[in-house]
Amino acid sequence: MTEKIYPISEEIKKNTLLDEETYQKWYRESINDPESFWAKHGQCIEWFKPFTKVKNTSFNDGVSIQWYEDGITNVAYNCIDRHLKTHGDQIALIWEGDNPYHDKKITYNELYEHVCRFANLLKNHGVKKGDKVTIYLPMIPEAAYAMLACARIGAVHSVIFAGFSAEAIAGRIVDCESTFIITADHGLRGGKRINLKDNVDHAIEIAARQNVRVDQVMVIRRTCGPIDWIEGRDFWYHEEITHAKTNCPAEPMNAEDPLFILYTSGSTGKPKGVLHSTGGYLVYAAITHKYVFDYHPGEIYWCTADIGWITGHSYLVYGPLCNGATTLMFEGTPTFPDKGRFWEIVDKHKVNTLYTAPTAIRALMGAGNSFVEHSKRTSLRLLGTVGEPINPEAWEWFYHTVGNDRCPILDTWWQTETGGHMITPLPGATPLKAGSATRPFFGVQLQIIDEQGNILEGEAEGNLCIIDSWPGQMRTLYKDHERFIETYFSTYKGKYFTGDGCRRDSDGYYWITGRVDDILNVSGHRLGTAEIESALVLHPAVSEAAVVGYPHPIKGQGVYSFVTLMEGTAPSEELQKDLIKHVRKEIGSIAILDKIQFAPQLPKTRSGKIMRRILRKIAENNFDNLGDISTLAEPQVVEDLIANRQN
């Protein structure tokens, strides 16, 4: 990792919201007196009834997290209504379609009307405060309308990434007991059609077998392609939306009422329903968006994330709209119709801030510089990265080639569970280092801890923990508070364990080194190894499977599968292809097996536990650091695995 320091640019210094001195002052205040700090910044949103209590949190037995607990507000009101008097005619949402010739611009006044109609349509179909609504949509404006409409009437949304399979959708429907689904006939991505309605139909059948019945499916028309239809259950959005009223009062919501459930991979294989509440989440999404992206009114802000991920929730929809920003939503991929698409969009819409994933950056870097050089990119002021640590080579390319040495790079570290940025540079306050997430955001107290639980001071490397709460923190895992405590607070008592490894350098900068648990970070998407292993062993040819990550030049981490076949089944290229297809069907298109190694046996301890540590080293080609293998029941298994490693 490089230690070269990139100073704060003079251009940014002239017009920044926060300089180095203010950052230090505010950070000290946020740690020494969090009540006062967050009381002040809690005013960044409008409250129907002001809060009198700020912070009521404990990471000890029982774990309880409450912020602004007696305040009453509404997320949709803050994202739309409060902007109407002063800038109702400003563009709220720019939509750029998969097809480069398709786009839309929606003002705040228009957004108000769309969301009110959508909210009334939900109400007309019996959806009420507290109901769970599943959203499985492509990146179209209606996806944002659906989220905001749920927030407006107090329904809890559960958005599912449109790349997930019917089985994955069903698991989420069953867990949150959702009886109402919003989907589209198809999605469009990279010029290809995705059968969303088909997936939903299959998911509903699977959920029904687990005694969860979906009563209504709202279908948004995207392609007009043929789909199956169930009369009495399915209804067309376009047929009913024009009859819905254009005014819908915003439901008064307690700050601690749930806003959404978002499922993320768990190390046990069953996805975890991360629950975020209303007041604290919105305050944190808004304040991080404002200061991390140094947001000034009138700027065009583009977060390339899908709404199916937390980044899409916090930094495509809720944070920017709460701040009255213009946010850009992109339906397509960075490489369609060619690898210059991102830069064309930047020029076309005069984008000032581009926030994207290292995976996309590495893929575009691999395409060479000519696509970038064919564009001007003069509107760009800031560049950001999210989803995984960015390697210094990709950082340097993004900075020099895309940003022409003048746009600070905001390498943000955070999680679905944190709701918003935790470690991040601030453009006017933080000198940069390529590959470092730099310093903690306000109110974030970090500790690096070794395997024995000792707190490490100064330069150190170990497990990253957070020792006190912040407003955007998840409140629980839906219907499973015990698992919430077990997952995040049992490893180090009284501390939130992130599951990430981290290094702190001599300047106090933090470098995220990757997951230390059984979660893979593939192209910025979290996949549980247990989830993939469970999918593999469902295949009739597979007796046993173990999955680990290995360094991948584009995706950050690749998926390496060690597979033991049933007695009498021979390995073949055909079977390999079938296993890849099978896992995609079970989990979704993001679960791609990069390497499959057929192994007659897996390395196990005498008690029968698979030694994944050894498999990880083999997958990484790191044969010299296998460590102690004397505890294995059959140590010779390791030699066979090394000899047959997939290059």
Curated annotation (Swiss-Prot):
Recorded catalytic activity of this chain's protein: acetate + ATP + CoA = acetyl-CoA + AMP + diphosphate
Gene Ontology MF annotations: acetate-CoA ligase activity; AMP binding; ATP binding; metal ion binding
Keyword Cell membrane attributed: no
Cofactor: Mg(2+)
Keywords: Acetylation, ATP-binding, Ligase, Magnesium, Metal-binding, Nucleotide-binding
Superkingdom per UniProt: Bacteria
GO biological process: acetyl-CoA biosynthetic process from acetate
EC number: 6.2.1.1
Acetylation is among the record's keywords: yes
InterPro entries assigned: Ac_CoA_lig, ACAS_N, AMP-bd_C, AMP-bd_C_sf, AMP-binding_CS, AMP-dep_synth/lig_dom, ANL_N_sf
Annotated binding of ATP, by residue: G387, E388, P389, D411, T412, W413, W414, Q415, T416, D500, R515, R526
Classification via Pfam families: ACAS_N (PF16177), AMP-binding (PF00501), AMP-binding_C (PF13193)
Binding site for CoA: R189, G190, G191, K192, T311, S523, R584
A cellular-component GO term for this protein: cytosol
CDD domains per record: ACS
Modified residues (N6-acetyllysine): K609
Database matches in SUPFAM superfamilies: Acetyl-CoA synthetase-like
Disulfide bonds: none
Binding residues annotated for Mg(2+), in chain numbering: V537, H539, V542
UniProt modification remark: Acetylated. Deacetylation by the SIR2-homolog deacetylase activates the enzyme.
Family statement: Belongs to the ATP-dependent AMP-binding enzyme family.
Function: Catalyzes the conversion of acetate into acetyl-CoA (AcCoA), an essential intermediate at the junction of anabolic and catabolic pathways. AcsA undergoes a two-step reaction. In the first half reaction, AcsA combines acetate with ATP to form acetyl-adenylate (AcAMP) intermediate. In the second half reaction, it can then transfer the acetyl group from AcAMP to the sulfhydryl group of CoA, forming the product AcCoA.
Protein name per the record: Acetyl-coenzyme A synthetase
